[in-house]
Amino acid sequence: MPAVLQQWIEKSEERNRRIQQLRNEVTEIMELNVMDVTYRMLVEFLADEEIEHISEMDYILRKKYEVYMSELIKEKSVSRYLRIFDKVKQEYIRKRIETPMGRLECQWTYKNTILFIPYHSDQKIVLSVERVKNRSNMVWDFQIDSSEKMKRQIFDVLEFILENYEPSRVREQKLTGLHIFYEFCRLRKIEDINCLEQVQEEDFQIFLERKIENEQRRNRLRSIVGLACRITFLQTKEIRWDATIWYLEKFKIPKERLNPSDPVERISFREVLHPENRKLLQEYMKYEIGIGEMAISTVYEKFRIIRNFLKEISDEQQKVTTCDAERIDQYLKKRQEDANEAKTFNTQVTSIQYFFKFLEVRGYVDKVPFRAEYYWEKQILVHHDRCVEEDVYMEIIQKLSNFPEHLRMMFLHLWCIGLRISEVCTLKGDAYYRQKGDYWMKIYQVKMKNYKRVPIPEALYDLMQVYLNKNRIAKEDYIFQNRKGGAFSKSTFNEQMKKYCAACDIQNGEYLFKSHDYRHTVATNLYDHGVSRQGMRCRKRILSGRR
């Protein structure tokens, strides 16, 4: 028998063996009694591709099958055959993950290949993408020649989106935005998303404009950069101290240092372009956050002052370690001209002094190159009359029924007791209690980092009991919550109050609501009715005439 014929016979026998093997697997997996033409075509294609088992089916093979069928049948019918390909693969995964070995084999993990979301091991995710599986954002090519670290970071963000966003337009926007951002990172040779620079993010916005014509859709997609930076920072085992943006939820900061009603969520070092200056600022912030005890809001205020200083000298390509008294004098005199109050300017001087003192202790400079006391300005305490006129707050009370319930309750705490808005926002379900016929409230003072108790009107106590029961607020829950169940934002409260004051035409629409004014109003009323300043300090912790 000729050798060529012998080879043909052997190949034919091998093909028939593969067909039988695959037919048995498909029949078992899909629980078929009879194979129709769609299954037969699939089996024959797999056999021709020398596929031995269904486990070898993947997205690359799917694309080949699509091309193969396009040459045999009408284009509109190809999708029918692709659905069968997907069903077989998905059913195989679904049944295999029921076993320990199968879970290990089919687990959705990062691989240097093309990943197809409909082949995810989580069946809930598979079902959620059934109607959108032909979109480009379902296909993720991790076999391209690019930074391995960047590709793994993109995969982590992809997983976060799939696991944390329900099937919706928002998830589609996140997936599409990430898909475009991944392409951008590949083309711009981004090595590490954690080290993304401001100029690169701005470049991405230009890249996005070329990709997406619709401005509204562009605006929805552009936020993906922030999400990618946040997730990649949070999911690393060790804190990335070299990252250009730090996200504070990564740090185990004692709650006494945090203000839940006005949280500092991130710290950006991107503005400081000089590498050495940025590194020193990162070292300083590592100390302030990790070892320091100041409230994070105070730390952040100092940070911004130092960052502005370093940004200016970095733009001049000057190292902070080479700054002399003359250069600092130039900078501080500029700030002196810009500052509205002596207190503001003195804070700037002190913050820069502390930073140089840190550099001195760490051995980066021999000594602080300027004397802060030379620049300090005398602070003259001025009483700012910020009291709300009676006709104003009475008009609000008369129209309070037009405000949402949570705003009504929060406003009453300002008007009745004179609390700080940060204290109102962080009240918890166990704040109110009755003792010996009197009504009290337990408050955590963010500013003082301590608890205090104050007497409250019986009417407010009764109203809050109804509110707590109606909204099923547990003892440890925040009474006024944001969408995620955390403390209500004080900035959101102020914005909403301004909106409803305008809508209710308070003072003919000219009244500008300021929450802290009500604290001054309560203090002034107490003083006018004979309560001494010392009495107000002890009882309400309110200093007359001070912010």
Which residue ranges define each predicted feature?
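Active-site/catalytic core of tyrosine-dependent DNA strand-transfer enzymes
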Residues: 457-510
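Basic, Lys/Arg- and aromatic-enriched nucleic-acid-binding interface segment
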Residues: 391-421, 519
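Short, charged phosphate-coordinating catalytic segments
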Residues: 363, 414-435
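DNA breakage-rejoining catalytic core of tyrosine-based enzymes
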Residues: 378-394, 448-458, 473-476
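Short, basic (Lys/Arg/His-rich) helix/loop patches that form interaction surfaces
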Residues: 494-538
